[in-house]
Amino acid sequence: LLKEFNFSTNIFNWEEFKLFDQYFERILVSKGTFLIKEGETERYSYFVFEGILRCWLLNYNGEEQTFWFCKEGTFSMSNISFTLQTRSAFNVQTIVDSVIYRIDKKQVNELYTAIPKVKTVFEDLNAILLNKLLKRNIDLIKYSPE
């Protein structure tokens, strides 16, 4: 995960890495499973270990419109709903059988207490993700055929 976002793996020592892993639950998720549906509030933060997720919604014509893919080594976009504890504006669904690690709010708070620098790292990861989303939106406008 840290390599995906160009973070140094030296941020945590070996003991912290082992402790970090204990807070996440490994789950196997079948193809086509919804991790969250539009209108629900996310109860977990998901990390994609193997597989791929798609983020989509119904457009004004009632057609499915995919706007983002969460690949291996990234967190699910449903983290927006999870972090803010607001209703999700979109669906997140597996498109292949996947191995996902998840953590709930209570475990996140315990993790932040056990390893305080994790909170800063997660905040930085969220900022990097937001920057990627903004860049994508700007590119769609900038390079539009209009």
Question: Where do the PLM segments sit?
Answer:
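Cyclic nucleotide-binding regulatory module and flanking cytosolic helices
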Residues: L1-L28, S81
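Cyclic nucleotide-binding regulatory domains
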Residues: S8, T33-I95
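Short acidic/polar alpha-helix capping motifs at helix-coil junctions
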Residues: E15-F20, L53-W56, K71-T74, A114-P116, ...
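Short N-terminal signal/transit or membrane-insertion segments
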Residues: L19-T41, Y143
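A generic structural signal for ordered secondary structure
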Residues: F24, I52, E64, I100-I103, ...
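Hydrophobic residues at beta-strand termini and immediately following loops
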Residues: I27-V29, C70, I103
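Polybasic "coupling" helices that flank or enter modular domains
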Residues: Q93-V96, Y101-E146
